[in-house]
Amino acid sequence: VLLATGRRTNAAGAAQVAALLAELDVAAIRTELPPQSMPLMGLLRIVDRDLAVGWPGAVPPEAAAALRARGFVLLEPPAGPELDVGRALNFVTLGPRRILMPDGNPATRAFLEQAGIECRSVPVDELAKAAGAVGCLTGILERCCPGME
């Protein structure tokens, strides 16, 4: 489990989560978020067992290294207004290599589709008023792990 400290999680809180995970025999990989970031999911999205999409140049190096060491490819779409203003990476993974993303991000969508990711999109005008998009409305209920069926 990637466990990040930053504006929302301090070292003491991360230590408590890491201790609980250790009791469950789950390793916590600690990393620190850049100062301008809040949740790790704002920088990094998992789209398949071996594929992640990250904010260009902002994914913490420890997180990127941990993913690559576990066989992940880390895609970084081109930086620009689609990421900053269009919230293109604020998407929801619907299934392996299938996502629901904010409308109006054609370059990012083309980049993701070229990587084999099926993209559906929806308008997020109202969500954007609260500085969010579809990813902000969701929580992960289940994530399958390699070797688990």
Regions found by a protein language model. Name each.
Residues 1-149:
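Histidine/cysteine-enriched polar flanking segments
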